């Protein structure tokens, strides 16, 4: 008997036979609107490469292409104990990372909840004091206070900051609900180091990093086939190693000990790709999301691919279908009319609904929005969620294909992290299929030359590996960034 392998799981979605013609017509229209074919993807990739290159010029472009000041590849042999901190919107994460020197590491971590009003305190010292006190608590917990050697620390600071060297970060503007005066325009490293020193903690901040660059470096440490770090979450971003000679905007700004063939990690911040709307296949719903956003005309790519906007797209389509008199008739939709009431967990849960009658979807709409749905309506909603999620995945991989083509990568691993990548049903498969369609690969998908794989912990292990590389440069007396920085 021929062994055919495991049976495919039964398709969850039932037949569309009971869906009225007027709703089926809408489903077909939505399919036409949200489906992105291979030819369109390739067109997007071509323009993406142009914009990546433009971002490296002195004049610049839509994509910032920020040098990350990591100028070596990890060897995987880096070893020792390092601290990493990650300042998020609600928690501070403190991590002790033990690099073993054989491409592996161990981590021990604690989370410290930010006091409710900390993000808007009028006294910036309170934030740095809180972080330093948390570090002290962690040092006591881990019995590290009496360590003879100074512990190098990598600081993951995922807020817009300009860097002229690895161990500085001048905050451009607060995001994620922070609004603390007298920090924007200042280097955050000495602000924190000052509070650490006041407490006589044996810690030195040697690197300030972006989480996407951290994802690239942590994954490269364990897997030298890593070509990129990417985030598919509330935002979208990518990081990769370019070569100094290709970064025109650094011409004449680097010391002689940074040769032109030196690698340089680049934090793309490519959520702003195609702000002119030249190639992205926007629907009227994407236009509405943009126009109603706090910054119209900005972050065009992010608004079509990131988790932050997927639920909002779903909400806008449903409201329009209701206005046409096609569904959710004669009901109070006041809750559904609140912008961003549907976060990404909604389309994710709807796509994951295991029941033939889409019972979970029915519960979601009744309990959370006070709205009753018919089975045909739920089938339309489910199909719409699939379309929005699949489109996001297919467009999101255009950034990957563009960087791989720009750098001439024919094979390799793309290390991915973020809530959408990790939790959104079908996203990984749709992303892999998107890459296959761009490149025209056929045959066994597991043998694809470029594959997206789960990333290592960028803001913890990545910060630690970068701290190790930075510490080595400091010890060797090498420059850490722009001349005079």
Swiss-Prot record:
Cellular-component GO terms for this entry? cytoplasm; cytosol; mitochondrion
Which residues make up the binding site for substrate? 158, 175-176, 210-211, 237, 269, 302
The residues covered by the Hexokinase domain are 21-468
According to the record, the residues making up region (Hexokinase large subdomain) are: 210-457
Post-translational modification Phosphoserine, affected residues? 245, 272
Q: Which InterPro entries does the record cross-reference, listed alphabetically?
A: ATPase_NBD, Hexokinase, Hexokinase_BS, Hexokinase_C, Hexokinase_N
* GO molecular function ontology, one term from the record: ATP binding
The record's catalysed reaction(s) read: a D-hexose + ATP = a D-hexose 6-phosphate + ADP + H(+); D-fructose + ATP = D-fructose 6-phosphate + ADP + H(+); D-glucose + ATP = D-glucose 6-phosphate + ADP + H(+)
Q: Which domain of life is it from?
A: Eukaryota
Any Pfam family from its record, for instance, is: Hexokinase_2
Major enzyme class: transferase
One GO biological-process annotation of the entry reads: intracellular glucose homeostasis
Q: Which UniProt keyword terms apply here?
A: Allosteric enzyme, ATP-binding, Glycolysis, Kinase, Nucleotide-binding, Phosphoprotein, Transferase
Q: Which PANTHER family match?
A: HEXOKINASE, HEXOKINASE TYPE 1-RELATED
Q: Which family does it belong to?
A: Belongs to the hexokinase family.
Q: What is the role of this chain? A: Catalyzes the phosphorylation of hexose, such as D-glucose and D-fructose, to hexose 6-phosphate (D-glucose 6-phosphate and D-fructose 6-phosphate, respectively). Mediates the initial step of glycolysis by catalyzing phosphorylation of D-glucose to D-glucose 6-phosphate.
* Subunit and interaction comment: Homodimer.
Q: What is this protein called?
A: Hexokinase-1
């Amino acid at each position: 008997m021929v062994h055919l392998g495991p049976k495919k799981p039964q398709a969850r979605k039932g037949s569309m036979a009971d869906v009225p013609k007027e709703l089926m017509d809408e489903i077909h229209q939505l399919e036409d609107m949200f489906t992105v074919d291979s030819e369109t993807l390739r067109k997007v990739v071509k323009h993406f490469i142009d914009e990546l290159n433009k971002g490296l010029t002195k004049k610049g472009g839509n994509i910032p292409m920020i040098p990350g000041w990591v100028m070596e590849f990890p060897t995987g042999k880096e070893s020792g104990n390092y601290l990493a901190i990650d300042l998020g919107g609600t928690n501070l994460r403190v991590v002790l990372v033990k690099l073993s020197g054989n491409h592996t590491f161990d981590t021990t971590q604690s989370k410290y909840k930010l006091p409710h009003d900390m993000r808007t305190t009028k006294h910036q010292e309170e934030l740095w004091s809180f972080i330093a006190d948390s570090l002290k608590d962690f040092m006591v917990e881990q019995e590290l206070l009496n360590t003879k050697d100074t512990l190098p620390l990598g600081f993951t600071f995922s807020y817009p900051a300009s860097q002229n060297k690895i161990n500085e970060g001048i905050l451009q503007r607060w995001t994620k609900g922070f609004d603390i005066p007298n920090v924007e325009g200042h280097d955050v490293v000495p602000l924190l180091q000052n509070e650490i020193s006041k407490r006589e903690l044996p810690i030195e901040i040697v690197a300030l990093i972006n989480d996407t660059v951290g994802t690239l470096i942590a994954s490269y440490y364990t897997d030298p086939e890593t070509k990129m770090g990417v985030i598919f979450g509330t935002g979208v971003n990518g990081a990769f190693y370019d070569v100094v000679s290709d970064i025109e905007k650094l011409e004449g700004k680097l010391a002689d000990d940074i040769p032109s063939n030196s690698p340089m990690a680049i934090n793309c911040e490519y959520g702003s790709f195609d702000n002119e709307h030249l190639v992205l296949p926007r629907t009227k719903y994407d236009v509405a999301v943009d126009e109603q956003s706090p910054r119209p005309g900005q972050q065009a790519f992010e608004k079509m691919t990131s988790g932050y906007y997927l639920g909002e797209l779903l909400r806008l389509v449903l409201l329009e279908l209701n206005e046409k008199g096609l569904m959710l008739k004669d009901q109070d939709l006041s809750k559904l009319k609140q912008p961003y009431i549907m976060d990404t967990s909604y389309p994710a849960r709807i796509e994951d609904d295991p029941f033939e009658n889409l019972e979970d979807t029915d519960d979601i709409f009744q309990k959370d929005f006070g709205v009753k749905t018919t089975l045909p309506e739920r089938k339309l909603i489910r199909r719409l969620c699939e379309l929005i999620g699949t489109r996001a995945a297919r467009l999101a991989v255009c950034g990957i294909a563009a960087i791989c083509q720009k750098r001439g990568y024919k094979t390799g691993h793309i290390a991915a992290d973020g809530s959408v990548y990790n939790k959104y049903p079908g996203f990984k498969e749709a992303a892999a299929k998107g890459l296959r369609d761009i490149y025209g690969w056929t045959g066994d998908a597991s043998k694809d030359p470029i594959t997206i794989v789960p990333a290592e912990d960028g803001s913890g292990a990545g910060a630690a590996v970068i701290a190790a590389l930075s510490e080595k440069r400091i010890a060797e007396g090498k420059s850490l960034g722009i001349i005079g920085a």
